[in-house]
Amino acid sequence: DAPANNSGLATGSEIVNYALQFVGNPYVYGGNSLTNGVDCSGFTQQVFGHFGIELPRTAASQASCGTSINVNDIQPGDLLFYDNGGYIGHVAIYSGGGQVVHASNEDTGITVSSVDYRTPVAAARYIY
């Protein structure tokens, strides 16, 4: 599927600033609430959805539906994907400065981490 033209719906910094408001909120597997609990792909789906940008529900689907970009060419607002035993099992929003904001796990909830807290295996862009 070709990604929709999301030009003008949001800038990378708007995506990041919105996402950062939810740092400290809980991680809940399968969750869709930015305040009461969300998982990694639910987090990205809800953040982008706030700006009218539709993302699929799973990390693997989000990786395949956006415009694929080189991990070294990421800009704030791009999505980074991480391997989970041979498949894409985690997604985070690049926030700039070598960091990502993501719904990490039940221990840390929504948090900011170094891009390379794990090795990113793919990146995708949904805003232009």
Where are the predicted features?
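Catalytic cysteine-centered active-site loop
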Residues: 25-76
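Aromatic- and glycine-rich peptidoglycan recognition patches
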Residues: 2-10, 17-18, 53, 64-69, ...
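Stable alpha-helical elements in mature extracytoplasmic
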Residues: 11-15, 19, 39-40, 47
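Short loop/turn microsegments at loop-to-beta-strand junctions
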Residues: 39, 89-90
